[in-house]
Structures are given as structure tokens and as C-alpha cells.
């Protein structure tokens, strides 16, 4: 408002004479400075309007209870190209170019008159001692000045005002400051050890320093306990529409107890006994047993069995005799019949299915024996090539012992083949079938 009133007052008081003079002579430096002042004043007024607008917004927001999000730009809002700054005093003269008055002094120095000086010495006696003073042998400092000193800085001590040729102070970190003369400096020919430190001379024990730990150990610190209600109504300048979740996840401090998340549990598969094959979701019935051989031949040809196994075999033979007349022979049925309800029956059934015709890559015992012989020969050759040396023999024995302990050497079992042999040995023997059926089995395994 003050600016507008001043503009109106200026327009009312304007004279035509001044305008005519301005038109005739052109813009003066004073008028150019006035324009820049007006422009700066308008900029200040615009900034004031922005400030008042922001203040009004703040006053409007001050009493509300709603949460407000404020987004701020990363850069200050400014024009892409800044205006060049122009000085207000464009028409003013440079003060360095101004001429200043110079005054000449006509008086001169009077020449020195030696005669008048000699006459004054006659009237005013001056006593000057011309006798040389005796030199002090214990003079402090480094002695006389050398002839090659050309400046005061080379004469004085660095960054001080001390003249080393007059007084030289030697600083000893243990004994303190000692003033030495040039005679003492010349007399010091042999070096002496410094005094022992106080920790040795006075038998003082130094405290053991605890090593500092520079590793970062996060700490939650002391959290103040504030007992306030969950809902605080009618608080001034506090937003009441904020919603947050109490589950904020794990804390940032890894050393806090109880922050390790629990791992999910996995269901492990339980080893179940082998079952018979399923065809279309229905259990296949066991194949009908083949006609057994006559009982006297079985008893005559079979080896003597233990008493625990002889009774069930005899009972099975009698049952087979009763059912042999009614059940005809079926092609493809197994030649050996075992009680399907037992665990050995399921094991043998799985072995037959896994190692049937063309499924299992079985090796004969001859090939295994040949491989073992080759391995033994190679070990003997290595032993003979490295033999004759005590350390090599010890090394070979140690290797053989390690192989025996780990199960890879000759002293260990035969691996999975040996385990299978032990399982097959534990199965009770089955009476041998008829001769033609045994030949067919051998043909099937060989093919």
C-alpha cells in the first residue's frame, strides 16, 4: 500500500519542466538508478506477497486435526537461465580515475657541515673507551657471528626472536632445558645414555591397558516407559485419523534376543515297506502256485533243514498235494512260491521286479575276481616301486589302514554286494524245483 501511495503522489507532483529537460538531455545516470530501485522494490513486493500467502496457508492448517503429507522438490524453484546482475551505479565515475590535487614542497635538506660538528665536539667532550674487552671463555651461545650471514632470518632461530650466537638453549625431553655455551658444545665428544624412565628407576608398575574394541555392537539402549492411554481425544494440533499396524517386523538390532524367525517345518517321508504292484488302482491277486513236485523226491534231494523251518515246508507240501489236482499250470508264473504274507516275500518280489530280464546289469563272479586280482597286483607293484624306504612303507601301511577303516580297503566288506549277499544268506532255503523249470530260469537270466 505504501508503494502505491508513493506512486500516486509522484504522479501528482510531477512537473512538465523536468519532463522536458529529461526529453532534451536524455536519460541521466540518476534516472537509470531510479529505475533499478523501482525494479528491486517490485521484486521485494512480490516476495512479500508470497510470504503473506504462505503465512495464510499455515494459519489455515494450524487448527486442523487431519494428517497432511507435504511433498518438497529436491531443487529450489529457480529459472533455468539466471539474469545477469546489473549494478545500480552504472553512470557513476570510477574513483580510481579521479584526479587529486598534488602539492610540491620547495624546502630541501640542509647539507652536513663537518666543521660545525668538530667545533661542537670541542665544546661537549665525549668519552669513548677504545680498549678491547677481554673475551669471556664461558660465553653463552654458539660464539662469534660467521661471515656468510646475509640476513636477519638466518641469524635468528626459526619463528622466534632468539639469537643463538648469544644464547643457545638445548631442550632435553627428560632432563629439561639446559643452557649450553660454545665451550661446552666443543667439549662434548662422547655420547652418554639418558637417565632411565621413572617406571624403571622408581620401580613403578604400569597398568595393563585393556584393548579397545572398535567393532560396532548395536544396542537398543534404554527405552523410556510411557504409561498413556491408547486413545487421546481432543488434543490440539494432533492428527486423529492416523492408522498404523503394530506388526513392524523384526528389529534392526541383530544382537537383540528373540529376533531370529522360526524356520518352517517340512514333512519328512516315512519309509514304508514295499507293496505289491497296483494295476488300475486294484491290488493284483498273487499268481496261482504251480504243481509242486512229489513229496518223496523233495525230501530225498533237499538238504537237511533246521527243525524250525522243516515243519512249515512240510505243511506247505501237504497243502500243495491237496490243491495240485485242481489247479492247472499257468505260463509266466514264478517257479518258487513263498508265503506272501511275510516280509521276505515282498522283498523277493521287489528284487524280481527290479532285476528281471534285461533290467539289472548283473556281473558274474569271474569278472569281480579278475578285478580284485588286478587291484592287488597294482598295489603290489606300487609297494615294490616305493619299497626299500622306511617312510614309504609306513605311508603305505597308513593308507591301507585308512582304507580299511573307511570301508574302501580289502579288509572292509564288499559294499552293497556284500550286504545283498548277507541278506540272501539270511533267507531260509527253498526246495529246488523240477529240472526242466530250473533250466528255463537259467535261460531267462542269461538272456
Curated annotation (Swiss-Prot):
Residues 331-447 are annotated as: VCA. GO terms for biological process: Arp2/3 complex-mediated actin nucleation; endocytic recycling; endosomal transport; exocytosis; regulation of Arp2/3 complex-mediated actin nucleation; retrograde transport, endosome to Golgi. The modification Phosphoserine is found at residue 327. Residues 364-380 have a biased composition (Basic and acidic residues). Transmembrane segments: none annotated. The keyword Membrane applies. This is WAS protein family homolog 6. Residues 284-296 have a biased composition (Pro residues). It comes from Homo sapiens. GO terms for molecular function: actin binding; alpha-tubulin binding; gamma-tubulin binding. WASH genes duplicated to multiple chromosomal ends during primate evolution, with highest copy number reached in humans, whose WASH repertoires probably vary extensively among individuals. It is therefore difficult to determine which gene is functional or not. The gene coding for this protein is located in the pseudoautosomal region 2 (PAR2) of X and Y chromosomes. Residues 406-418 have a biased composition (Gly residues). The gene is WASH6P. Keywords: Actin-binding, Endosome, Membrane, Phosphoprotein, Transport. Residues 343-365 form the WH2 domain. Residues 438-447 have a biased composition (Acidic residues). The keyword Membrane applies. It comes from the Eukaryota. InterPro entries: WASH1, WASH1_WAHD. Residues 1-149 are annotated as: WHD1. It is found in: Early endosome membrane; Recycling endosome membrane. Belongs to the WASH1 family. Residues 1-42, 279-389, 403-447 are annotated as: Disordered. May act as a nucleation-promoting factor at the surface of endosomes, where it recruits and activates the Arp2/3 complex to induce actin polymerization, playing a key role in the fission of tubules that serve as transport intermediates during endosome sorting.
Amino acid at each position: 500500500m505504501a508503494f502505491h501511495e508513493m506512486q500516486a503522489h509522484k504522479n501528482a507532483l510531477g512537473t512538465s519542466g523536468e519532463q522536458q529537460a529529461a526529453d532534451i538531455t536524455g536519460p541521466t545516470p540518476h534516472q537509470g538508478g531510479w529505475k533499478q530501485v523501482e525494479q528491486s522494490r517490485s521484486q521485494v513486493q512480490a516476495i512479500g506477497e508470497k510470504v503473506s500467502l504462505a503465512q495464510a496457508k499455515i494459519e489455515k492448517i494450524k487448527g486442523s486435526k487431519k494428517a497432511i503429507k507435504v511433498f518438497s522438490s529436491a531443487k529450489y524453484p529457480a529459472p533455468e537461465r539466471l539474469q545477469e546482475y546489473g549494478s545500480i551505479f552504472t553512470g557513476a565515475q570510477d574513483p580510481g580515475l579521479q584526479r587529486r590535487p598534488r602539492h610540491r614542497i620547495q624546502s630541501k635538506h640542509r647539507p652536513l657541515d663537518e666543521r660545525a660538528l668538530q667545533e661542537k665536539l670541542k665544546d661537549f667532550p665525549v668519552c669513548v673507551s677504545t680498549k678491547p674487552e677481554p673475551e669471556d671463555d664461558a660465553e653463552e651461545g654458539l660464539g662469534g657471528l660467521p661471515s656468510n650471514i646475509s640476513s636477519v632470518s638466518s641469524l635468528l632461530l626459526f619463528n622466534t626472536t632468539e639469537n643463538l650466537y648469544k644464547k643457545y638453549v638445548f631442550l632435553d625431553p627428560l632432563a629439561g632445558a639446559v643452557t649450553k655455551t660454545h665451550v661446552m658444545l666443543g667439549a662434548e665428544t662422547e655420547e652418554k645414555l639418558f637417565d632411565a624412565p621413572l617406571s624403571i628407576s622408581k620401580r613403578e608398575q604400569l597398568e595393563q591397558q585393556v584393548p579397545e574394541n572398535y567393532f560396532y555392537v548395536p544396542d537398543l539402549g534404554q527405552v523410556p516407559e510411557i504409561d498413556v492411554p491408547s486413545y487421546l481425544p481432543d488434543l490440539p494440533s494432533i492428527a486423529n485419523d492416523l492408522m498404523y499396524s503394530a506388526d513392524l517386523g523384526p528389529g534392526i538390532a541383530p544382537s537383540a534376543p528373540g529376533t531370529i524367525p522360526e524356520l518352517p517345518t517340512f514333512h519328512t517321508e516315512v519309509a514304508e515297506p514295499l507293496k505289491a504292484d497296483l494295476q488300475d488302482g486294484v491290488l493284483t491277486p498273487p499268481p496261482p502256485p504251480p504243481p509242486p513236485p512229489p513229496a518223496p523226491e523233495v525230501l530225498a534231494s533237499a538238504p537237511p533243514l533246521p527243525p524250525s523251518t522243516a515243519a512249515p515246508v512240510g505243511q506247505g507240501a501237504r497243502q500243495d498235494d491237496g490243491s495240485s489236482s485242481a489247479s492247472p499250470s499257468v505260463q509266466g508264473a514264478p517257479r518258487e512260491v513263498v508265503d506272501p504274507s511275510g516280509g521276505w516275500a515282498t522283498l523277493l518280489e521287489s528284487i524280481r521286479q527290479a532285476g528281471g530280464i534285461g533290467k539289472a546289469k548283473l556281473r558274474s563272479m569271474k569278472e569281480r575276481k579278475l578285478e580284485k586280482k588286478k587291484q592287488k597286483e597294482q598295489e603290489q607293484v606300487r609297494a615294490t616301486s616305493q619299497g626299500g624306504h622306511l617312510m614309504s612303507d609306513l605311508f603305505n601301511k597308513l593308507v591301507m589302514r585308512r582304507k580299511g577303516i573307511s570301508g574302501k580297503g580289502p579288509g572292509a566288506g564288499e559294499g552293497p554286494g556284500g550286504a545283498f549277499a548277507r541278506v540272501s544268506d539270511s533267507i531260509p532255503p527253498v526246495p529246488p524245483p523240477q529240472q526242466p523249470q530250473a533250466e528255463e530260469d537259467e535261460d531267462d537270466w542269461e538272456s
